[in-house]
From Swiss-Prot:
There is a cross-link at residues 79, 354 (Glycyl lysine isopeptide (Lys-Gly) (interchain with G-Cter in SUMO2)). Residues 218-450 are annotated as: Disordered. One of its GO terms (biological process) is negative regulation of DNA-templated transcription. This is Corepressor interacting with RBPJ 1.
Amino acid sequence: MGKSFANFMCKKDFHPASKSNIKKVWMAEQKISYDKKKQEELMQQYLKEQESYDNRLLMGDERVKNGLNFMYEAPPGVKKENKEKEETEGETEYKFEWQKGAPREKYAKDDMNIRDQPFGIQVRNVRCIKCHKWGHVNTDRECPLFGLSGINASSVPTDGSGPSMHPSELIAEMRNSGFALKRNVLGRNLTANDPSQDYVASDCEEDPEVEFLKSLTTKQKQKLLRKLDRLEKKKKKKKSDKKKKKLQKSKNKHKKRKNKSPSSSSSSSSSSSSSSSSSSSSSSSSETSDSSSESDNKEKKREKEKRKKKKKTKCSESKSSDCKEDKPKNMLYEELSSSHSDRGKAQEKLRFPKQESSGENSMWVHSASDRTSRSHRHSPEKKGSDRNRGIRSRSRSRAESSRRSRSRSPYRQKHREVRSRPHRSPSEEQKGRKGTRSHGEGDHRREHVR
């Protein structure tokens, strides 16, 4: 019941946690490390050969110069065999005594760092600093020099073959073996170039500035603080003035660019407005109004003066346009009235002999009819004048309203100006002519009836 899924899967051959797979991986790793060591040995051998070859060249050996050195040297395999024989003849050093006659595998023969467990006893791959023996540390009770300092350990009688217990020698041996003490333990025995050995000023020595400040009174300190505050304020003011100057320069450049554009547009608009249309004048006024909102007070005053002048010119133009529009109408009315009067005179000449034969009563009737006809003849002229007056009054009222609207909204100027213009189609003019003719013909018919 207590077995888990991992325990079940580790027994499978394909699972990486199985014992067979772990063993295979470990064996492969050991073989790779063995091959690497072989390659390193070959490289070291090659480097030694090169060094010897270079030394011989420096010494001036003729064999090396002629390239015949290979004939007088033994092959590399012979040297290895000789070394192995020497090692077997001499006593090899082992970490532990039980390793002397113990059998080992090929991959573990030359490697002394591999941990072994003979007879199930755990072997520690550790070396003591004091007695230089493997299997324990200087803090273990197994060490014969346990509980003794370096000086006392050096005074203990030991064999001549044993290592010395002097602390400097111990530190050197530790470094050679790959160990090192902490800096806190070493203390002052370090070199003079070490940064921890630099000269540090004591607390008693104080800076001259601090001493000067301590010697001052409270009033003098307050004065110093005030001076420092003033200097800081001056620096801040200088910075703010520089920023303001930069902003003013940028604004002036921007204004100059904008003033150039509306001046050119206003000149073009004035030339076009004097020629034909009032729409160009409205566009120039809108441009000036936009530029005045962004410019300063001085520019606003100048633009106001320009506006007044333009308004005067516009009023004169509108009046002249109204007069021009009214002139052709008046001419038409005068022509119509003159034509009607000529016709009436011709008809009267034909009727005079008939009227003389008739009595005095008919004379009185003709005189009355002449008065009525004259009144009717003069009536269209009066009507035309009345119409012209009404049109002029309307155009003036609309012009005033358009001026007010321009000051308020420049975008509706065009629409209102188009409305203010009194346009009449040719059909309407023909109707007006027919109406005047019908009035004249009606008068003549009445005369004939009478």
